[in-house]
Amino acid sequence: MATTLEIIQDALDRLCIARRPSTLDVTDDTQRQMLALLNETGQDLCLAFQWQALTVPVVTPAADDNNNLSDQGEVATLCPGLSRFVDDCLYLNGRMMPLIGPVDVQGRTFLRAGGMSVLYGFFVEQGHLWITSPTTSEQELRFAYISKNWARDSQGSGIDRLTQETDVPLLDARLLTLGTVWRWLSRNGLPYQQEFLNYDNALRVLQAADTPRGIISASGPHTYNPRRSLLGGVARPWA
């Protein structure tokens, strides 16, 4: 995987700008701007797509909480570096459908009042994850989330911003380079349309390659939908 310095040097080469010293020097205006634009590119990519490299699966015991709203604990502990939850991917053992959410105040009130009690909902409030039903520690909470930490430092710790030349992004280095190049041209008032098209094309190709393929249905043209299938695997004709 390419380091921060290697990506910046690649971007300088593409722009026909002389490379700076072999170390990252943030007192140099060009390198400082390149670093800022590289971070902007990485952070935008993190928010724009559900990258598999940033997807974190979690399996943890549910909390012992008999209240209608059960507190599962601090989100910062359950999901270090949380950017957002993966849609339709929060399950409680013993229930065949994913928990609905994050639900708004109206939805919470509806579920707590007994409306469609077969469904559980979840929401985040005051830094805690809540489920709209009692839970026990015998149950397991299973979900996945997207991490905001799109890079690693030299110690292997997740980070959401590059600061050192040895930091390593988890996203595609070429895509980050192309994103940095078109942003640099734009910021400096230079034509950037072709470089943006190059970036956008690379982004689409990588998104297509990174998207898991759907499950083939043996029951006709029905698409697989975990919310509508009784058994995870083959979509049912009545789904």
Task: Provide a role label for each language-model segment.
Residues 1-239:
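Glycine-enriched, solvent-exposed interface loops adjoining structured elements
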